[in-house]
């Protein structure tokens, strides 16, 4: 249902790739979160453990968007873009100090270049 709605709202109107982040639905276990990449012809999902931070870290959307866009422009693959963005963000968030407000972009830049958690996208 989420895939069909996103495809109708965005992809059918000219967007080549639409990402849906922080997807929590009744069929997703409580301790996990899903992220989708949707194109005209395909849809991919990555499921990761849920890492909750209070307050929500600054820069997550910017980081996800920049990694996803950069990877997509380089590879033309929605699957690759999804995996790179999710793996980078998961690595950064999971290495945050308790109570920190900002992503550790400098201290954990290795998570951008070579994320240590290689979650794989599966077709949905």
Regions found by a protein language model. Give the residues of each.
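Glycine-centered flexibility sites
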Residues: 14, 22-23, 59-61, 75, ...
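Alpha-helical scaffold segments in soluble metabolic enzymes
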Residues: 5-9, 67, 71, 80, ...
């Amino acid at each position: 249902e989420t895939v069909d709605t996103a495809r109708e709202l965005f992809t059918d109107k000219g967007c080549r790739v639409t990402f849906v982040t922080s997807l929590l639905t009744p069929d997703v276990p409580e301790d996990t979160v899903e992220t989708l990449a949707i194109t005209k012809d395909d849809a991919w999902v990555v499921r990761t453990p849920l890492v909750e931070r209070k307050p929500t870290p600054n820069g997550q959307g910017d980081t996800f968007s920049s990694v996803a866009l950069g990877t997509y422009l380089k590879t033309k693959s929605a699957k690759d873009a999804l995996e790179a963005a999710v793996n980078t963000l998961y690595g950064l968030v999971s290495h945050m100090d308790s109570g920190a407000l900002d992503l550790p972009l400098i201290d954990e830049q290795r998570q951008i270049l070579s994320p240590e958690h290689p979650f794989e996208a599966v077709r949905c």
